[in-house]
Regions:
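C-terminal helical subdomain
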Residues: 59-60, 67, 76-113
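Residue(s) in the substrate-gating loop at a strand-loop-helix junction
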Residues: 19
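A short helix-coil junction within the Rossmann-fold of NAD(P)-dependent oxidoreductases
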Residues: 1-13
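Hydrophobic structural elements of the Rossmann-like NAD(P)H-binding subdomain
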Residues: 15, 57-60, 70
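Alpha-helical segment proximal to the catalytic Tyr-Lys
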Residues: 3, 47-49
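Active-site helix of classical SDR
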Residues: 35
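Catalytic tyrosine of NAD(P)H-dependent dehydrogenase/reductases that use a Tyr as the general acid/base
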Residues: 32, 40
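Active-site loop immediately N-terminal to the catalytic Tyr-X3-Lys motif
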Residues: 24-30
Length: 113
């Protein structure tokens, strides 16, 4: 895809989704946390490499989110107290729809308190 984005010369946006697990150490989460940290690093590197082509690269790292997997792993957790997938989707929509230059290459952490 990046090959075609470069050729378009119209300026594009890439948004990658990582996780707070990639920036917060947790025992027993080595593989998952490492893969999410790699997404953050990849996004930052791509932002540098693609800037000359007017391609903006963002990364978001959601915290706890009410998904089917989360319900399975933490069945006693109150799902209403954590982020809903729709909330993450709204943030993604806002990031992609705005012409925000100062966020290029940033990892944006989103959490529900």
């Amino acid at each position: 895809c990046v090959k075609y984005m470069k050729a378009s010369k119209q300026g594009c946006k890439i948004l990658n989704v990582a996780s707070t697990a990639g920036i917060t150490p947790r025992p027993g989460w080595l593989s998952y946390a490492s893969s999410k940290a790699a997404i953050v690093s990849m996004s930052q590197t791509l932002a540098e490499e693609l800037a000359e082509y007017r391609i903006k690269v963002y990364c978001i790292s959601p915290g706890r989110c009410a998904t089917a997997l989360r319900r399975k792993l933490a069945p006693s957790e109150d799902q209403s107290q954590i982020m809903q997938p729709e909330e993450v989707g709204e943030i993604i929509t806002q990031l992609i729809s705005q012409n925000e230059h100062c966020l290029d290459g940033q990892n944006i952490v989103i959490r529900k308190k």
